[in-house]
Amino acid sequence: MRPAGRSNNQVRPVTLTRNYTKHAEGSVLVEFGDTKVLCTASIEEGVPRFLKGQGQGWITAEYGMLPRSTHTRNAREAAKGKQGGRTMEIQRLIARALRAAVDLKALGEFTITLDCDVLQADGGTRTASITGACVALVDALQKLVENGKLKTNPMKGMVAAVSVGIVNGEAVCDLEYVEDSAAETDMNVVMTEDGRIIEVQGTAEGEPFTHEELLILLALARGESNPL
Protein backbone atom coordinates (compact mmCIF):
# COMPACT_ATOMS: atom_id res chain seq x y z
CA MET A 1 0.00 0.00 0.00
CA ARG A 2 1.37 3.40 -1.03
CA PRO A 3 1.20 6.48 1.22
CA ALA A 4 -2.32 7.95 1.29
CA GLY A 5 -3.56 4.77 -0.39
CA ARG A 6 -2.64 5.92 -3.91
CA SER A 7 -2.64 3.47 -6.80
CA ASN A 8 0.68 2.90 -8.55
CA ASN A 9 -0.23 5.18 -11.46
CA GLN A 10 -1.82 7.94 -9.38
CA VAL A 11 -0.17 11.32 -8.84
CA ARG A 12 -0.70 13.31 -5.69
CA PRO A 13 -3.23 16.17 -5.75
CA VAL A 14 -1.68 18.95 -7.86
CA THR A 15 -2.48 22.64 -7.41
CA LEU A 16 -1.11 25.57 -9.40
CA THR A 17 -1.87 29.01 -7.96
CA ARG A 18 -1.00 31.69 -10.52
CA ASN A 19 -0.05 35.31 -9.77
CA TYR A 20 1.05 34.23 -6.30
CA THR A 21 3.36 37.23 -5.90
CA LYS A 22 2.81 40.71 -7.30
CA HIS A 23 6.26 41.81 -8.49
CA ALA A 24 7.40 39.02 -10.83
CA GLU A 25 6.12 38.95 -14.41
CA GLY A 26 5.04 35.37 -13.77
CA SER A 27 4.60 33.60 -10.44
CA VAL A 28 3.11 30.27 -9.44
CA LEU A 29 2.83 28.32 -6.22
CA VAL A 30 2.89 24.68 -7.29
CA GLU A 31 1.85 21.93 -4.91
CA PHE A 32 2.34 18.20 -5.48
CA GLY A 33 0.76 16.86 -2.32
CA ASP A 34 2.92 18.16 0.53
CA THR A 35 5.69 19.36 -1.79
CA LYS A 36 5.33 23.10 -2.30
CA VAL A 37 7.50 25.24 -4.58
CA LEU A 38 7.28 28.95 -5.39
CA CYS A 39 8.22 29.54 -9.04
CA THR A 40 8.76 33.02 -10.47
CA ALA A 41 9.72 34.21 -13.95
CA SER A 42 11.58 37.52 -14.28
CA ILE A 43 12.25 39.36 -17.55
CA GLU A 44 15.38 41.36 -18.34
CA GLU A 45 16.26 43.11 -21.58
CA GLY A 46 19.47 41.80 -23.10
CA VAL A 47 21.14 38.40 -23.25
CA PRO A 48 24.37 36.83 -21.98
CA ARG A 49 27.54 37.89 -23.77
CA PHE A 50 27.84 34.66 -25.74
CA LEU A 51 24.45 35.37 -27.39
CA LYS A 52 24.83 39.07 -28.16
CA GLY A 53 24.04 39.98 -31.75
CA GLN A 54 22.47 36.62 -32.54
CA GLY A 55 18.89 37.86 -32.30
CA GLN A 56 17.68 35.28 -29.83
CA GLY A 57 16.72 35.13 -26.19
CA TRP A 58 17.80 33.02 -23.24
CA ILE A 59 16.16 31.20 -20.37
CA THR A 60 18.05 30.35 -17.22
CA ALA A 61 17.02 29.04 -13.81
CA GLU A 62 17.97 29.07 -10.16
CA TYR A 63 16.81 26.53 -7.58
CA GLY A 64 17.01 26.51 -3.83
CA MET A 65 15.49 24.98 -0.73
CA LEU A 66 14.48 27.04 2.28
CA PRO A 67 16.33 25.98 5.43
CA ARG A 68 13.28 24.35 7.01
CA SER A 69 11.73 22.91 3.87
CA THR A 70 13.06 19.55 5.11
CA HIS A 71 12.65 17.53 8.30
CA THR A 72 15.72 19.10 9.88
CA ARG A 73 17.15 22.53 9.16
CA ASN A 74 19.66 22.83 6.34
CA ALA A 75 21.84 25.94 6.24
CA ARG A 76 21.33 28.23 3.28
CA GLU A 77 23.88 27.61 0.54
CA ALA A 78 24.62 31.34 0.50
CA ALA A 79 25.80 31.01 4.10
CA LYS A 80 28.09 28.16 3.06
CA GLY A 81 29.58 30.28 0.30
CA LYS A 82 28.93 27.86 -2.56
CA GLN A 83 26.19 25.91 -4.29
CA GLY A 84 26.04 22.15 -3.95
CA GLY A 85 26.27 19.80 -6.89
CA ARG A 86 22.63 18.75 -6.51
CA THR A 87 21.46 22.37 -6.69
CA MET A 88 23.46 23.09 -9.84
CA GLU A 89 22.24 19.89 -11.48
CA ILE A 90 18.59 20.70 -10.77
CA GLN A 91 18.67 24.31 -11.91
CA ARG A 92 20.37 23.30 -15.16
CA LEU A 93 17.67 20.68 -15.68
CA ILE A 94 14.92 23.27 -15.15
CA ALA A 95 16.53 25.68 -17.61
CA ARG A 96 17.10 23.01 -20.28
CA ALA A 97 13.53 21.78 -19.97
CA LEU A 98 12.00 25.22 -20.40
CA ARG A 99 14.33 26.31 -23.21
CA ALA A 100 13.01 23.34 -25.16
CA ALA A 101 9.50 24.77 -24.83
CA VAL A 102 10.27 28.23 -26.23
CA ASP A 103 11.18 29.55 -29.68
CA LEU A 104 14.26 31.47 -28.56
CA LYS A 105 14.54 33.31 -31.90
CA ALA A 106 10.97 34.56 -31.54
CA LEU A 107 11.74 35.64 -27.97
CA GLY A 108 14.29 38.14 -29.21
CA GLU A 109 17.02 39.54 -27.00
CA PHE A 110 15.35 39.04 -23.65
CA THR A 111 16.56 36.90 -20.76
CA ILE A 112 14.04 35.18 -18.52
CA THR A 113 15.20 33.86 -15.16
CA LEU A 114 13.14 31.17 -13.48
CA ASP A 115 13.55 31.07 -9.71
CA CYS A 116 12.28 27.93 -7.99
CA ASP A 117 12.29 28.07 -4.20
CA VAL A 118 11.22 24.96 -2.31
CA LEU A 119 9.02 25.92 0.63
CA GLN A 120 8.31 22.35 1.71
CA ALA A 121 9.89 19.16 0.41
CA ASP A 122 8.20 15.77 0.31
CA GLY A 123 9.75 14.26 -2.81
CA GLY A 124 9.64 15.41 -6.42
CA THR A 125 10.88 18.97 -5.90
CA ARG A 126 12.61 19.14 -9.29
CA THR A 127 9.60 17.83 -11.20
CA ALA A 128 7.28 20.19 -9.34
CA SER A 129 9.68 23.05 -10.11
CA ILE A 130 9.64 22.33 -13.84
CA THR A 131 5.85 22.06 -13.93
CA GLY A 132 5.31 25.26 -11.96
CA ALA A 133 8.04 27.20 -13.77
CA CYS A 134 6.44 26.35 -17.10
CA VAL A 135 3.21 28.09 -16.09
CA ALA A 136 5.10 31.08 -14.65
CA LEU A 137 7.04 31.31 -17.92
CA VAL A 138 3.86 31.33 -20.01
CA ASP A 139 2.48 34.21 -17.96
CA ALA A 140 5.73 36.18 -18.20
CA LEU A 141 5.89 35.74 -21.96
CA GLN A 142 2.30 36.88 -22.27
CA LYS A 143 3.25 40.08 -20.42
CA LEU A 144 5.78 40.80 -23.18
CA VAL A 145 2.99 40.44 -25.74
CA GLU A 146 0.58 42.61 -23.76
CA ASN A 147 3.25 45.30 -23.37
CA GLY A 148 3.84 45.35 -27.12
CA LYS A 149 7.41 44.04 -26.91
CA LEU A 150 6.54 40.81 -28.73
CA LYS A 151 3.95 40.24 -31.43
CA THR A 152 3.14 36.67 -30.43
CA ASN A 153 3.85 34.42 -27.47
CA PRO A 154 6.97 32.37 -28.36
CA MET A 155 5.90 29.41 -26.21
CA LYS A 156 5.88 26.30 -28.41
CA GLY A 157 3.94 24.15 -25.98
CA MET A 158 3.54 23.21 -22.36
CA VAL A 159 6.03 21.08 -20.46
CA ALA A 160 5.49 18.94 -17.38
CA ALA A 161 7.64 16.58 -15.36
CA VAL A 162 6.90 13.64 -13.12
CA SER A 163 8.96 11.22 -11.07
CA VAL A 164 8.61 7.47 -11.51
CA GLY A 165 10.43 4.62 -9.89
CA ILE A 166 10.49 1.05 -8.70
CA VAL A 167 9.56 0.65 -5.04
CA ASN A 168 9.27 -2.80 -3.48
CA GLY A 169 9.48 -4.30 -6.95
CA GLU A 170 6.58 -2.25 -8.35
CA ALA A 171 6.58 0.64 -10.83
CA VAL A 172 5.02 3.74 -9.27
CA CYS A 173 4.69 7.41 -10.22
CA ASP A 174 5.12 10.69 -8.34
CA LEU A 175 7.17 9.37 -5.43
CA GLU A 176 6.82 10.89 -1.99
CA TYR A 177 9.91 11.22 0.19
CA VAL A 178 9.41 7.92 2.01
CA GLU A 179 9.12 6.14 -1.35
CA ASP A 180 11.98 8.04 -2.96
CA SER A 181 14.34 7.20 -0.10
CA ALA A 182 13.51 3.49 -0.42
CA ALA A 183 13.30 3.22 -4.23
CA GLU A 184 15.31 0.60 -6.08
CA THR A 185 15.09 2.80 -9.20
CA ASP A 186 14.45 6.54 -9.28
CA MET A 187 13.66 8.39 -12.50
CA ASN A 188 12.57 11.89 -13.51
CA VAL A 189 10.92 12.38 -16.89
CA VAL A 190 10.30 15.73 -18.59
CA MET A 191 7.85 15.68 -21.48
CA THR A 192 5.98 17.99 -23.83
CA GLU A 193 2.20 18.14 -23.89
CA ASP A 194 2.14 15.91 -26.99
CA GLY A 195 4.16 13.21 -25.24
CA ARG A 196 7.65 13.86 -26.61
CA ILE A 197 10.54 13.43 -24.21
CA ILE A 198 12.79 16.35 -23.29
CA GLU A 199 14.91 14.66 -20.65
CA VAL A 200 15.12 11.43 -18.68
CA GLN A 201 17.18 11.10 -15.51
CA GLY A 202 17.23 7.54 -14.24
CA THR A 203 19.34 5.89 -11.56
CA ALA A 204 19.44 2.40 -10.12
CA GLU A 205 19.80 2.94 -6.39
CA GLY A 206 20.25 -0.76 -5.71
CA GLU A 207 19.63 -3.48 -8.29
CA PRO A 208 20.09 -2.41 -11.94
CA PHE A 209 16.84 -2.06 -13.86
CA THR A 210 16.06 -3.86 -17.11
CA HIS A 211 15.18 -2.47 -20.52
CA GLU A 212 11.64 -3.74 -20.03
CA GLU A 213 11.38 -1.90 -16.71
CA LEU A 214 12.66 1.27 -18.38
CA LEU A 215 9.88 1.07 -20.97
CA ILE A 216 7.29 0.48 -18.24
CA LEU A 217 8.49 3.54 -16.32
CA LEU A 218 8.49 5.74 -19.43
CA ALA A 219 4.96 4.62 -20.30
CA LEU A 220 3.88 5.35 -16.74
CA ALA A 221 5.44 8.82 -16.90
CA ARG A 222 3.83 9.56 -20.24
CA GLY A 223 0.43 8.56 -18.97
CA GLU A 224 0.67 10.74 -15.88
CA SER A 225 2.44 13.80 -17.32
CA ASN A 226 -0.24 14.54 -19.91
CA PRO A 227 -2.92 15.53 -17.35
CA LEU A 228 -0.38 17.84 -15.70
Curated annotation (Swiss-Prot):
UniProt-recorded Gene Ontology molecular function terms: 3'-5'-RNA exonuclease activity; RNA binding; tRNA binding; tRNA nucleotidyltransferase activity
Is the keyword RNA-binding assigned to this protein?
yes
**GO BP term, pick one:** rRNA catabolic process
Give the induction annotation: The catalytically inactive protein is present at significantly lower levels than restored wild-type protein (at protein level).
> Which positions bind phosphate?
R86, G124, T125, R126
User: Which InterPro entries does the protein's record reference?
Assistant: ExoRNase_PH_dom1, ExoRNase_PH_dom2, ExoRNase_PH_dom2_sf, PNPase/RNase_PH_dom_sf, Ribosomal_Su5_D2-typ_SF, RNase_PH, RNase_PH_bac-type, RNase_PH_CS
Q: Which UniProt keywords apply?
A: RNA-binding, rRNA processing, tRNA processing, tRNA-binding
Q: Which GO terms describe its cellular component?
A: cytosol
What changes when the gene is disrupted?
Answer: When the gene is deleted the strain no longer inhibits 5'-processing of pre-tRNAs with short (<5 nucleotide) leaders in the absence of rppH. The truncated allele encoded by this protein has a slight growth defect, which is slightly exacerbated when combined with an rppH deletion. The truncated allele suppresses the loss of viability conferred by deletion of RNase 2 (rnb) during stationary phase at 31 and 42 degrees Celsius or starvation at 42 degrees Celsius.
What other remark does the UniProt record contain for this protein? Answer: The gene in K12 strains MG1655 and W3110 (and also other derivatives of K12 W1485) has a frameshift mutation that leads to loss of activity, although the protein is translated. Thus in those strains rph is an expressed, catalytically inactive protein. In strain K12 / MG1655(Seq)* the wild-type protein has been restored. For the functional protein without the frameshift mutation see AC P0CG18. The (restored) wild-type protein plays a significant role in tRNA 3'-end maturation when a C nucleotide follows the mature CCA terminus. Wild-type (restored) protein also plays a critical role in initiating 16S rRNA degradation (leading to ribosome degradation) during starvation, but not in rRNA quality control during steady state growth. The wild-type (restored) protein is rapidly turned over at 42 degrees Celsius during starvation, but not at 31 degrees Celsius with or without starvation; in the absence of RNase 2 (rnb) protein levels do not decline (at protein level).
HAMAP family in UniProt: RNase_PH
* Description of how the protein assembles with itself and partners: Homodimer. No interaction between the inactive protein and RppH or RNase P was detected by immunoprecipitation.
UniProt family annotation: Belongs to the RNase PH family.
Described function: This an expressed but non-active exoribonuclease allele. The catalytically inactive protein translated in strain K12 MG1655 inhibits the 5'-processing of primary pre-tRNAs with short (<5 nucleotide) leaders in a dominant-negative effect when RNA pyrophosphohydrolase (rppH) is also inactive; perhaps inactive Rph inhibits interaction with RNase P which is exacerbated when RppH cannot cleave the triphosphate of the primary transcript.
This protein's name:
Truncated inactive ribonuclease PH
Name of the gene encoding the protein in the UniProt record: rph
